[in-house]
A protein has these predicted regions:
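Outer-membrane beta-barrel proteins
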Residues: 2-245
């Protein structure tokens, strides 16, 4: 697992170069492997089948990595990178970023897979995601999720299926409602409201926010009402930039 730490401009440049080299190398390798597999498979079939698939990489920068309203980098910058493969509605991918928790945890890597598609005017997505952390103990966890969307709205339900940090945490859920405003031009505006529930009368966290985007840039305002940790978080305002390849 790679660790990307935010420290100084030279360190950031080194991390960017390392992430780009890693993702480009992995992408090239997977493309070659997939092409060879398709050639061998078509040679063994009487009727060749055309496989529609894609492999894409991404790298992102933000002055604050915020997840469900909570900073994951102690209000510091983050560099992230990911790789996604999709074919016929099925998809799988991985994503990594630096983090900064109270212990020695300093990096996060996610692995996910699922199936997404459309049924008329309704979109849907069902999948599984595992969150893994290096440098700390008992923080890994995984969720299953289902999402439906229509007319600019999307509703996503996530359910915790496994967690190293709490043996009794199986009832944790997160419900998110998002809305993409129908704007013309290059700008986009989306609204978000989420509820994090630990299946008790007190352990509930809500977060809400707004994101303004243009091209590869986005500006997000995020506020959380946090009962998990019995404190009130200040509004988070952060800028993000992402590129794909």
């Amino acid at each position: 697992m790679n660790t990307y730490l935010y420290a100084s401009p030279p360190c950031i440049l080194n991390n960017i170069e390392r992430i780009l080299k890693m993702l480009i190398s992995l992408k090239d390798h997977l493309v070659k492997t997939t092409a060879i597999g398709l050639l061998l498979g078509s040679a063994s079939l009487a009727t060749p089948v055309k496989a529609e698939s894609s492999l894409e990489g991404n790298i992102g920068f933000t002055n604050n990595y915020v997840w469900r309203g909570m900073t994951q980098t102690d209000d510091q910058a983050a560099i992230s990178g990911g790789l996604d493969f999709s074919a016929g509605g099925f998809y799988a991918g991985t994503w990594a970023s630096n983090v900064d928790f109270a212990d020695d945890t300093n990096s996060e890597q996610d692995v996910y897979f699922g199936f997404a598609g459309d049924a008329g005017d309704v979109s849907y997505d069902v999948g599984y995601i595992a969150y893994m952390y290096s440098g700390g103990d008992d923080l890994d966890f995984s969720e299953i999720y289902i999402s439906v969307g229509a007319a600019g709205f999307s509703l996503t339900y996530s359910y915790l299926v496994d967690a190293d940090y709490d043996a009794d945490s199986g009832d944790e859920t997160y419900l998110a409602l998002d809305y993409e405003l129908p704007l013309s031009g290059d700008f986009g505006v989306s609204l978000h409201y989420g509820i994090y529930d630990k299946d008790s009368e007190t352990d509930e966290q809500t977060d809400f926010g707004m994101t303004i985007s243009k091209d590869d840039f986005s500006l997000t305002f995020s506020q959380v009402d946090d009962e998990f940790f019995a404190n009130d978080e200040d509004m988070k305002i952060f800028v993000s930039y992402g590129i794909g390849f």
